[in-house]
Structures are given as C-alpha cells and as structure tokens.
C-alpha cells in the first residue's frame, strides 16, 4: 500500500490542564515552523477568551509543524468530556494520538474518556508523561496506571506496546528516560517518536475524491468553511464537486478557495491530496459530518455517531423589568438565530423550539458545556434568561432511565469522610477508595447526573478548595425513584423595585446570606439572598432609614453588614430551583423567580400545597 511519508496526522488528548496546549506551543517553538526570533505567547492555541481564562480547551484547533522534511499536522482537542463532540470528530481525521498525562496526577476520568474514543478508532498511541519536574512526580507509577487503563479499555496488542516520552513542556525539555536528570532542552525525542511510530497516511490520490467535514468555521470574506481531511483523491481550486448531505441529498458546487495549515496560520493553497488536512470554501450550507465527493463518482463516508446530550436547560428571551438595558441583542429572533448558528458548529448541542415562541430547549453534554455557551452569548452582547439544568431521561427496554457518571475525587484525608457522606446523600455509590501520597485520598463514585448538579460549589467549600473533582458520563440506568435533589434552603425575594439600602440589609441579614451589595438596583421577584430555612421569604430590601439632622441614613452602618456572597455563572445555575431563572446580561447575572409578582406567586404556592394534600 502506497503511503505519504512526508505527513503525519496526530491529535493531542489529555485531561484538563495536563499541559497539552503548552506542549504544542513548545513543538512550534522547537520545529522549523516559525521564523527565527519569532516569539509566541503562552497558550497560543487557545484563541477563545474563555479558554484562556479557564485554562481549558473548548474548540479543536489545528496547526502544523515542519520537522526533518516532514509535516506534522497537530489537532489540539478538548480535555473535558462536556466537549466530547469535538474529540470524536477529531479522532476521524488522524492516524495517531499523543496521550498527555500529568506525572503527578496520573490518569483521570476525562483521560479515560478521550483515550477510549482514540482506541475505538484503532489509532496508534504515544504516551507523553508531562510535568516530570513537578514536586511529587511519580512517572513510572503513572506509566503503569496508563497501561492498566489501556487494558481496561480493551486496547489491542499493538496499542499496548506504546512508546513513552517524558517531558516538561513548560521548560521545553524531553527524554526517553523517566529520570528527571536526563531531561534535555529539546523536543527531538518526541518528534522522532512521532515520525517513527505514527503511520503515514495512505496515498490513494489517484482515486475519486472523498473529503470529510469535521469542523466548521466562518469567514466574512469567503463564508462558511469546512475543515477536514482528504481521505481519497485530489481537490483543486475551481473543481466542480458534489456535497453529500446528511439527509441523503446531493448538491453540486465549485471550490472557490482551499486553505492549508502552517504554524498557527491558515494559508491559501491551490491543491490538496489524500492525507492532507485542509479547509474548503464555496458551499454555504456545508455541515459537520458531510462528504465533499468527486462529481462523477459521488460516494459518501459513513457519518459520525456522537454520544447524545445528557443535560438540558430552557433558554428564553429576557423579560425582567430590566430587559433591554444592558444588552445589544435582546429580541427572540436574535437569540434564536444565534442558538441555531451555534448548533451548526457544535455537534453536541441540540436546540429545540417550545410552545413559547420566546423560549428554546437547549441540550448539551454537561453543565460546563452549557455554561460556556451562556458565557459566550453574554460576552457577545446577548441578554437571556435560563432555567435550572435538568438531566435528559430516556426509555431503555421499556424502563425509564437517567444518566450516571463516574466521579473521581482527590481530597486531603481530613475531608474524606465529609465527601463520602455528601455524595452518598446524592445517591452516589463508592466504587473504590485509595490512600495516596502526601495525605491525599482518591475516591471513585458512580453517581446520578442530577445528583451532581450544584455539587461542585458544595464540594469546593467542604474541602476548603483543596479537593479536585472530575466526572464523565458512564451509562444510563433505571431512574432512582422518590428522590428530588436540589437546593434545600429557600430564598429572600425582593417585594418591590428600587435600590437596596444598607439599613434594610441590616435587618434582613439575620434571615440568611445576602447575595447583593448595598446600592444594587432590584425589582419585584428578584432573589437577593438565601434563606437559612426551607421556605421563601419576601423582604423589603429598599427600605430607607428616616433622615435626622445629625447624619444621613445608612452612612454609618456599612461596617456592620456581613460581606454578601457573589455567585459566578456556574454557581448561579447550580443555585436555581425549578421556579427560578438566572437572568444573564453582558453586565450582570441576576437570580429571579419565574413569577415576579408577589401575590401571584403566593397564589401559586397555595394551589401547589392544596394539590399535594389531595
């Protein structure tokens, strides 16, 4: 079989923050790709602002490095299972993977998730043990953990015989030996291992064209762009080709531009052939999973199966009294268009209409997946309201089932009991408990996804920020009956509109924890605090102190107010109950009741109580 020895196509897969993006940066620096004296910023492949802030990779990036007359096409994939749709698409474009594992933390749930996807595609693995210079690093033990994981996931004999390279990407060093003293300031061992181990792509350029779209992009000048791999044949600018749609239909179009990848740039090219990773423009409604084929011999590549969404939320137009004040895009049409556009590029996302023309059911792979979408919309200038995340139930063999996840926790020993107790209350079942080094314990649980909604805040508080938790979808199993997780405490709800006063807050704070600062504008039905008891309380938070001729109202009370709690977006979503919304604008995140009017809310509560007594 003829191959193209000048090309290697690889993906980098790893758990969140194990250093894969830093590794790609170092490969760019040390290859023949960038001009001399050219400096690249840290985490260069993370172009999305949210990715930079959170230190996670959401969207797959592709780049290419030149080394010893070879072009190594590198795809950087997300390390979080919530973005698994991206991982699965990338696996179809490559012939091998670099599995990056932290020399201290070892294998983690998301490492398992992405590795499983790679092994299922029969890709050739290279294991990179990164951060070998980290305090407490245990590279040899971690290699054993990786081998155990390969065996557990059903790797074949060839995959089990994986080469290992030890690196410190932050320092730009690597070695074939686990001893940190053997590290040299070069990535040559890694480059050489890639060239030697990863199979070269098959060269069937003389056969009819097949190009598979794996990632979508958009450019104001050329419109929609399909990024993928040429699996067969050749493609040139000006060619008349056929787009094989997912619904079975065919559309002919002319290739207007082709782009190749070099370093961090996308450069125009005139021709590409089997094995190349390229971008194609010329067809406005091209979608992920579709095939660009030879016009005379059109043949589609089997579409990719993506794991289904497990979590859903209602997204709706903002109808609070403050609607339209802070956002640029506030109408139902604008929000719907943006959500539908997101669905075109994110194959893990599903957007469905509801009976309400101003609301949509948005389904995704997890809390992080959906919260990143909300944060993106917010930064783009959108206003919206969102409901509490809910799991997606499925009927399997006539039995109603819900999603369960594997939860892996590393916590200081003194918090182990509290963590076990808290997860047990959320119907988690402990599968394993391993005492680790440095006073740490590793816990493995199987827990229902709905029990994990809102758990991360509780977990971080419980472990004083020292605990590390990650979880990944495991399976659907029969629904746990007669159990309703969620916030157990009630809320403090504003009874009127105005500005919150220090004087009023002093009288209210004994009822619970305040969530806003003095001077914050509020409206009727807005949540201003968490009650210390189970019921909701309506409060007058705008009440002013009568002025005297001695001093102005509120001037001397500030020192007596406990510091209010300020929630992040994720914490706000976790806080919500069924009768509440989170109002999201470019400037603020507010919590509110679905029914704003106090009297209407009380009537609804009476009806619910009466119904429950029947």
Name the predicted role of every residue range.
Residues 1-614:
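Structural and coupling elements of P-loop NTPases
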